[in-house]
């Protein structure tokens, strides 16, 4: 009963509508019992196919190509099923696109009604070929006949008039160019005869890659010029600044030299001042006779006593004038200046009357060389030192015989010569070697012994002690003036 109920519902729209037979007489109207099942999975066996289609109706015969035991590798298989009832074959077509194992089945009625042999069956393996086994009006959409004669038509026959009759009516000439027969030079001639049409190209044919390199070079050159110009401008503006800096640095270094109590520098300054003063006095002394020296020294002693006070006043006035315009390194320079000048004054006064320590105070006190000594002051200092030396000699000459004094003078002069010759002005500027300094330190120690003899002899004068006290009071007053 299930067959009879299902068959009419399917037979009405399906095969009965196709062949044109009546609803009941669909089977007699040329229906077939054999179906062709393509796109069967290669892993499917004939037993599985039998079970699948056995639900639809009684199966007379079932064959699977290639068979299960075939050694050939198979992409897909073909199965032919012959039902006992042709209606069950119609129902089986509904299994089309049913996925079996891993593929969708294609079920088509086979027109011949007999299961074919293996060779023919394998030719129908492809789904497109499977359609060729259908009846001309059966089942699926009709397929047009294959165009076997396309390759036989020559290309020359496919001109413009043959393709479209409307083009032939326009009277256009046919194609007269055969690219195979034309040579390259002929093509060039042909192209030269044609009038050129100029159209602006939207995209650049040659990519401008070189532009970036050239532009970068130009930029670099321009930047170089800019840098050169900047350097020139700065060079034109800054030389004044550089000179100022140099001046500042020089003044600073000078002030530092004043501050630092390095013994080597003080030695240099002492030797310089001594050399200048003694060199002139020596030359004069050598030219003069001892008698003349004595008379001159007495006169000079008197003069120096009278004129020393006036000189001190002049110096104070000059210092006041200078203090109105203080330099940058004012405080340090002023201290050093005032101290050095006071020491000089003390020496000038006390050295004339109290010759207890003729040389030793000179070494200790005149350490800081005043940086801005004028030529006039230098000359005055030289005169003072000359007068001092001559006074010392005159006092000692009174108490000792002439012969002894001459010997001493020779000795002292020779010692001074040794001292002053050892030092060079240029060498002082460049910097002293440690060995020279050691030698020079030894020499003053050796030369100090004859001077101490003179000191012991010259202590006896009583009036010198009194006058030194008076001088001390004067120095206190001068110190007060300087501090003001």
Curated annotation (Swiss-Prot):
GO cellular component annotations of the record: nuclear speck; nucleoplasm; nucleus
Q: What is its main location?
A: nucleus
An example Pfam family from this entry, by short name, is RRM_1
Q: Name one GO biological process term.
A: RNA splicing
Positions modified as Phosphothreonine? Answer: 325, 447
Extract the ranges annotated as region (10 X 8 AA approximate repeats of R-R-S-R-S-R-S-R): 247-353
A GO molecular function held by the record:
identical protein binding
Stretches forming sequence repeats: 247-255, 258-265, 267-274, 275-282, 285-292, 293-300, 302-309, 321-328, 334-341, 346-353
Skewed-composition ranges (Basic and acidic residues): 309-320, 380-395, 402-424, 433-478
Domain RRM span(s) in chain numbering: 33-113
Describe its assembly.
Interacts with PUF60.
Query: What name goes with this protein?
Result: Serine/arginine-rich splicing factor 11
Q: Which organism is it from?
A: Homo sapiens (Human)
Q: What gene does this protein come from? A: SRSF11
């Amino acid at each position: 009963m299930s067959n009879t109920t299902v068959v009419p519902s399917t037979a009405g729209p399906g095969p009965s509508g196709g062949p044109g037979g009546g609803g009941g007489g669909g089977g007699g109207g040329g229906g077939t019992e054999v179906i062709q099942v393509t796109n069967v999975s290669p892993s499917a066996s004939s037993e599985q196919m039998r079970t699948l289609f056995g639900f639809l109706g009684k199966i007379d015969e079932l064959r699977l190509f290639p068979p299960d035991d075939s050694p050939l590798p198979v992409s897909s298989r073909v199965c032919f099923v012959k039902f006992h009832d042709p209606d069950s074959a119609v129902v089986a077509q509904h299994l089309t696109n049913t996925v079996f194992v891993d593929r969708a089945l294609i079920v088509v009625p086979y027109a011949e009604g007999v299961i074919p042999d293996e060779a023919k069956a394998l030719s129908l393996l492809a789904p497109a070929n499977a359609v060729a086994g259908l009846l001309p009006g059966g089942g699926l959409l009709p397929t047009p006949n294959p165009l076997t004669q396309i390759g036989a038509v020559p290309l020359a026959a496919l001109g413009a008039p043959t393709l479209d009759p409307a083009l032939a009516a326009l009277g256009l000439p046919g194609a007269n160019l055969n690219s195979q027969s034309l040579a390259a030079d002929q093509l060039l001639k042909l192209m030269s005869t044609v009038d050129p049409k100029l159209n602006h190209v939207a995209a650049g044919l040659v990519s401008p890659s070189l532009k970036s390199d050239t532009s970068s070079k130009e930029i670099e050159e321009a930047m170089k010029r800019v840098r050169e110009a900047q350097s020139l401008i700065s060079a034109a503006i800054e030389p004044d600044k550089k000179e100022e800096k140099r001046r500042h640095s020089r003044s600073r270094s000078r002030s530092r030299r004043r501050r630092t109590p390095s013994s080597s520098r003080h030695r240099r300054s002492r030797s310089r001042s001594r050399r200048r003063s003694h060199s002139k006095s020596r030359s004069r002394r050598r030219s003069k006779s001892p008698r003349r020296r004595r008379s001159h020294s007495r006169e000079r002693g008197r003069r120096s006593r009278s004129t020393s006070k006036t000189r001190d006043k002049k110096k104070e006035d000059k210092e006041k004038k200078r203090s109105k315009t203080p330099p940058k390194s004012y405080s340090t320079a002023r201290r050093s200046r005032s101290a050095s000048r006071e020491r000089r004054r003390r020496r000038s006064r006390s050295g004339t009357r109290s010759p207890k320590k003729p040389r030793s105070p000179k070494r200790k006190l005149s350490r800081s060389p005043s940086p801005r000594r004028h030529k006039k002051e230098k000359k005055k200092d030289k005169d003072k030192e000359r007068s001092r030396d001559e006074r010392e000699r005159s006092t000692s000459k009174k108490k000792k015989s002439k012969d002894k004094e001459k010997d001493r003078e020779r000795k002292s002069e020779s010692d001074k010569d040794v001292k002053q010759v050892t030092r060079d002005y240029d060498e002082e500027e460049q910097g002293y070697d440690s060995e020279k300094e050691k030698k020079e330190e030894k020499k003053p120690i050796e030369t100090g012994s004859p001077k101490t003899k003179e000191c012991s002899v010259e202590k006896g004068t009583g009036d010198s002690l009194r006058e030194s006290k008076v001088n001390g009071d004067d120095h206190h007053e001068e110190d007060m003036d300087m501090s003001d």
